[in-house]
C-alpha cells in the first residue's frame, strides 16, 4: 500500500507563493520595492461634549479630509485649507442627525513621543524612524458642539392629483412619527417608501414631489410634508426580448413572470430580470420601461439581453499524498438544444480513480424551475479497500421546495458493477435505486463562503437485481455553517458535520464501493484515503454501515489574496447501522494556506493524525485543490 508522504510541501509552497505580489522576479533575485511616500501623514479625530459613537461615525463618513487620508497634503498649510473646506461637511453631518444648531471648529497638532524605551515594539521603532525621516504624524481634530437635537413635529402626507382611489399610507407605516429624532435619513427613506408603495399598487408613474421640512428654532421641532403624484393605475402590455437570437422564444416566454393585462408591479419586473439571468445564457439583462402608455393604454416592456458564449472548456489539477496527482477536464454547453439545456462532460483521473461522466439538464419541464436531470458514468477504482469497475445511468426531476435556496429531487438510477474487495473474490452487482435529495444553501459564496449555512440530505433504497438480491436503504446528511468572527470577515469559523447510515443488509452483503469510509482530503485530513476506520488482518479498509464526521476550521484572511487555516477533523466508521461514538475515534489536525483567485481559493492543507497507528498511518498528509475544504 502506497502510504508514504513525499516532499510535496517543499515543492508546492514556492509554486503557490510565486503568484503573490510579495515576490517579484528580476534576474532570479527577489527585489524589495518600497514606494516613496511624501507629504504629511495625518489622522482625523472628532471630539466635543455630547459626541457619541453615532455622531462620530457619521461625521467621519461625511468628512472629505478623512476620506482623503491616503493622499497626504504637501504641507501643514495645505492640510489646514483642506480642514477649513471640510467644516461645511461636518456641520451638514450634524444636521443630518437632527442637530440643526451644531457648530464645528478644528485644530492641527503634531504628535511626538520623546520617551521611547528599549521595550518598544518593532512597529514602534519603525514609526520612530519614519518620524525622524519624514516628520511625526499629525492629528486633525474637529471640535464639535452638537447643540440640542431637534425632534419630529407634524408629519403630513399629500397626494397630488389622486387617481383610481389611491389611499396614502400613514406616517407610522412609513416609519416616521412625531417625537422621533429629526434626522434626515428616515425622512428620505419615508419619501422613497411612499413612492414604492404607490408603484407596488400599480401606479407605475408615481413620483415624489418636493419634500418640505420646516425647522422651528423656538420649539426645536421639524414639521415634514411628503407629497407624491401617483398617475393612473397601469396594466402591462406586450413584452419583447431583444438580443436572444439563438434561444427558443418559447423557453424565454416561460421565464417572464407577467402577462399582458396584469397590473404593474415593480417586484415582478425585477424578478423577471433575475429569472432571465438565472438561465446562465446572458451576460447582461436590461429592462426598458417607457414613461408613457402605448396606443392600447398599456405599458410595453422590453428586456434587452446580451448572449454569453454557450460553450466552456476547462481543466483542473490537484495533489494528495494518499491519492497522488489528480487531473480533471470538462466541456460544457449551456444551450445544447436551443432552449437552455445544459450538457456537461467530465473526465477525472488519479491513480485511485478514473471516471468519465455526462450530465444533462432540461430546464422548465412542465413548470418554471422544474428540471429534468439525466446522467451517465463509466468508472474504475483501485483503492486499498477494493477494485471496482462500473457503468451507470440515472434520471431525476428537480424542483424548488418551500422557499428560495431549497431544492429537492427524486429519480431512478441503475449501476452495473464488478467489485473485488481486497483478498476476496470478485462479485457482480446490478443495483437499482430510487435516490431522493433535499438541498438547502443559504451561504454567500459557492467556493469561498463567509457566512450562512448549507444542508444536504440523501436517501436511496437499493436492490440488487442479480445474484444476492440484497436490499438496503442508504441515507446521508451533511451540514456546514460559516460564522464571521469580525464584521470584515477577516476571521471565519467554519463547521461541518456528516452522518451516514445503511440499513437492511449486513456489511458483507453491501457492495464494497457503497459502504462508508473515512479518511482523506474530503473527510478526516491527516489519515490516508479510506483508512480512518476498521481494517482487516492485512490492514486494508473494510468500510462500514455508518459514518460520523465532525470538522472545524478557523480561517484567517491575512491579505486580499492570502489566507491561513487551522483545522481539526474527527470521526469514525462503524459496522452498526446507526452512527456511534463508541468506536475508535480518529482525529486529524493541521494547517492550510489559501491563495485567493477569481475562480476560488487555491487550497494547500497539511494534516497529521493525532492518534497515529504505527506502520499504517503516515506522519503527514498533503492536499492541494481548488476551493475551500467545505
What is the role of each PLM region?
Residues 162-169, 265-456, 525-526, 530-541, ...:
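Gram-negative/organellar outer-membrane beta-barrel architecture
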Residues 226, 331, 572-576, 610-612:
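Short, solvent-exposed loop/turn segments at secondary-structure junctions
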Amino acid at each position: 500500500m502506497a502510504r508514504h508522504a513525499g516532499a510535496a510541501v517543499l515543492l508546492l509552497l514556492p509554486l503557490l507563493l510565486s503568484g503573490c505580489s510579495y515576490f517579484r522576479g528580476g534576474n532570479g533575485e527577489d527585489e524589495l520595492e518600497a514606494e516613496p511616500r511624501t507629504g504629511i501623514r495625518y489622522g482625523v479625530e472628532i471630539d466635543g461634549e455630547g459626541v457619541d459613537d453615532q455622531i462620530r461615525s457619521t461625521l467621519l463618513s461625511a468628512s472629505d479630509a478623512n476620506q482623503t487620508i491616503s493622499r497626504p497634503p504637501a504641507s501643514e498649510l495645505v492640510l489646514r485649507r483642506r480642514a477649513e473646506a471640510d467644516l461645511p461637511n461636518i456641520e451638514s453631518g450634524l444636521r443630518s442627525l437632527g442637530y440643526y444648531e451644531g457648530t464645528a471648529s478644528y485644530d492641527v497638532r503634531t504628535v511626538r513621543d520623546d520617551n521611547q524605551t528599549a521595550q518598544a515594539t518593532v512597529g514602534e521603532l519603525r514609526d520612530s524612524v519614519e518620524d525622524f525621516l519624514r516628520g511625526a504624524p499629525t492629528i486633525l481634530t474637529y471640535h464639535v458642539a452638537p447643540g440640542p437635537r431637534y425632534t419630529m413635529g407634524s408629519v403630513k402626507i399629500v397626494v397630488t392629483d389622486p387617481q383610481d382611489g389611491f389611499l396614502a399610507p400613514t406616517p407610522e407605516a412609513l416609519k416616521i412619527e412625531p417625537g422621533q429624532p429629526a434626522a434626515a435619513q428616515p425622512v428620505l427613506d419615508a419619501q422613497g417608501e411612499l413612492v414604492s408603495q404607490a408603484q407596488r399598487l400599480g401606479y407605475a408613474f408615481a413620483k415624489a414631489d418636493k419634500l418640505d421640512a420646516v425647522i422651528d428654532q423656538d420649539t426645536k421641532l421639524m414639521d415634514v410634508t411628503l407629497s407624491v403624484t401617483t398617475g393612473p393605475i397601469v396594466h402591462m402590455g406586450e413584452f419583447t426580448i431583444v438580443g436572444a437570437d439563438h434561444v427558443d422564444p418559447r423557453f424565454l416566454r416561460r421565464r417572464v413572470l407577467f402577462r399582458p393585462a396584469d397590473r404593474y408591479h415593480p417586484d415582478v419586473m425585477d424578478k423577471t430580470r433575475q429569472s432571465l439571468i438565472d438561465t446562465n445564457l446572458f451576460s447582461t439583462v436590461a429592462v426598458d420601461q417607457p414613461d408613457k402608455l402605448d396606443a392600447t393604454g398599456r405599458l410595453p416592456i422590453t428586456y434587452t439581453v446580451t448572449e454569453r458564449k454557450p460553450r466552456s472548456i476547462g481543466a483542473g489539477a490537484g495533489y494528495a499524498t494518499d491519492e497522488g496527482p489528480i487531473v480533471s477536464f470538462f466541456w460544457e454547453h449551456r444551450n445544447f438544444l436551443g432552449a437552455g439545456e445544459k450538457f456537461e462532460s467530465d473526465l477525472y483521473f488519479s491513480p485511485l480513480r478514473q471516471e468519465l461522466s455526462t450530465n444533462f439538464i432540461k430546464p422548465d419541464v412542465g413548470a418554471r424551475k422544474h428540471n429534468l436531470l439525466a446522467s451517465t458514468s463509466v468508472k474504475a477504482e483501485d483503492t486499498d479497500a477494493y477494485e471496482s469497475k462500473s457503468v451507470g445511468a440515472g434520471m431525476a426531476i428537480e424542483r424548488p421546495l418551500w422557499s428560495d435556496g431549497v431544492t429537492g429531487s427524486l429519480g431512478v438510477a441503475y449501476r452495473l458493477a464488478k467489485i473485488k474487495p481486497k483478498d476476496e473474490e470478485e462479485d457482480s452487482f446490478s443495483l437499482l435505486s430510487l435516490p431522493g435529495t433535499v438541498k438547502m444553501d443559504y451561504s454567500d459564496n459557492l467556493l469561498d463562503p463567509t457566512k450562512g449555512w448549507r444542508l444536504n440530505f440523501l436517501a436511496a433504497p437499493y436492490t440488487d437485481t442479480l445474484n444476492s438480491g440484497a436490499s438496503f436503504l442508504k441515507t446521508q446528511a451533511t451540514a456546514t455553517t460559516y460564522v464571521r468572527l469580525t464584521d470584515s470577515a477577516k476571521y471565519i469559523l467554519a463547521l461541518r458535520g456528516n452522518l451516514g447510515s445503511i440499513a437492511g443488509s449486513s456489511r458483507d452483503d453491501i457492495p464494497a464501493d457503497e459502504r462508508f469510509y473515512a479518511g482523506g482530503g474530503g473527510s478526516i485530513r491527516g489519515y490516508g484515503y479510506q483508512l480512518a476506520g476498521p481494517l482487516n488482518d492485512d490492514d486494508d479498509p473494510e468500510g462500514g454501515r455508518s459514518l460520523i464526521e465532525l470538522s472545524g476550521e478557523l480561517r484567517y484572511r491575512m491579505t486580499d489574496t492570502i489566507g491561513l487555516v487551522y483545522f481539526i477533523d474527527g470521526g469514525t466508521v462503524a459496522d452498526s447501522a446507526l452512527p456511534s461514538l463508541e468506536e475508535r475515534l480518529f482525529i486529524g489536525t493541521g494547517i492550510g494556506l489559501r491563495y485567493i483567485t477569481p475562480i476560488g481559493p487555491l487550497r494547500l492543507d497539511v494534516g497529521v493524525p493525532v492518534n497515529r497507528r504505527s506502520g499504517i498511518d503516515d506522519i503527514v498528509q498533503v492536499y492541494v485543490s481548488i476551493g475551500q475544504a467545505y
